């Protein structure tokens, strides 16, 4: 479990690095992108094609990492994604958006 948590933390740092002209952190700070309850990021409000590409890139990286974690731990990828969603929401800075269990966007 400690290895899983360490890996999830590393993943969060990795996907926060710039993926295009707009970074994930910038998009989250501006309220354009938020942490979805699925363990992936999603567009909170109208996004540009650049933001849509950023979201797709980040989610592809997360999906790949979640799959590797799931395989190592012999669990389903949905379990990894759900646990990641909990961790990401807990670490989210004040003012950024997350999706609650009912799918509503909330500002922390």
Residue ranges and their predicted role:
Residues 22-53, 73, 77-108:
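Amphipathic, charged alpha-helical segments and their helix-to-coil junctions
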Residues 12, 54-55:
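A generic structural signal for short
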Residues 1-20:
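Classic N-terminal secretory signal peptides
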Residues 55-70:
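Short, well-ordered alpha-helical segments
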Residues 2, 59, 90-91:
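Short linear sequence motifs
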């Amino acid at each position: 479990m400690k290895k899983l948590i360490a890996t999830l933390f590393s993943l969060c740092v990795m996907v926060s690095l710039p993926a295009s002209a707009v970074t994930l952190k910038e998009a989250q700070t501006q309220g354009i992108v938020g942490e979805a309850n699925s363990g992936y990021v999603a567009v909170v409000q109208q996004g540009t094609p650049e933001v849509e590409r950023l979201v797709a890139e980040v989610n592809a990286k997360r999906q790949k990492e979640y799959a590797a974690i799931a395989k190592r731990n012999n669990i389903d990828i949905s379990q990894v994604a759900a646990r990641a969603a909990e961790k990401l929401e807990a670490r989210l800075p004040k003012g950024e958006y997350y999706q609650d269990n009912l799918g509503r966007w909330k500002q922390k």
